[in-house]
A protein has these predicted regions:
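Short glycine-enriched loops at secondary-structure junctions
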Residues: 59, 106-111
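Short acidic/His/Gly/Ser-rich catalytic and metal-binding motifs that mark active-site loops
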Residues: 111-117
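Intrinsically disordered, low-complexity Ser/Thr- and acidic-rich flexible linkers and loops
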Residues: 117-123
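N-terminal pre-domain/capping segments
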Residues: 1-102, 123-147
Length: 148
């Protein structure tokens, strides 16, 4: 059995696409390839170029493949659905354009849950309506990921 190990821009401290502290996306690709990796995750949508005609050749010239992407958005918050949907659509488009097979959905940190992080017995729980909305938003993006 062969195990393939890739990397991700978060290894370079990239958590948000427009953070001025981020290294250049080309630096991330260069150093990832130099370290011997052959696969990389997309990082936050907007960090790497969204134009496949720019990112594709950059990956290919370094013998790298885009292997997946993460949507880190406020799935718990119906007021932020448009932002969540936008980030999800853009991520799925990039994954499809480059043949990546892995889509990871992560609910962002909330002011409500942060104070009890790591202590589930103390955490305030979603009510039935909140839970149903959360699940439906996740399902919507999961379907998009399988259909794109």
């Amino acid at each position: 059995m062969t195990i393939l190990i890739g990397n991700a821009p978060c290894s370079w401290g990239v958590e948000f696409a427009k953070d001025e502290r981020n290294p250049a996306w080309t630096t991330v690709l260069d150093e990832c390839a130099e370290a011997g990796y052959r696969g990389i995750e997309l990082g936050p949508v907007g960090f790497m170029p969204e134009d496949p005609d720019v990112l594709g050749p950059a990956l290919e010239s370094r013998n790298l493949a885009l292997i997946g992407g993460v949507v880190f958005r406020a799935f718990h918050d119906p007021e932020k659905w448009e932002d969540t949907l936008d980030g999800s659509v853009r991520t799925c488009k990039a994954l499809k354009a480059h043949g990546a097979k892995h889509l990871v959905l992560i609910d962002s940190i909330s002011d409500r849950r942060a104070p009890t992080a790591g202590r589930p017995e103390e955490a305030e729980q979603m009510d039935d309506a909140e839970w149903a909305g959360f699940v439906e938003r996740i399902r919507t993006i999961a379907r998009m990921g399988t259909e794109e």
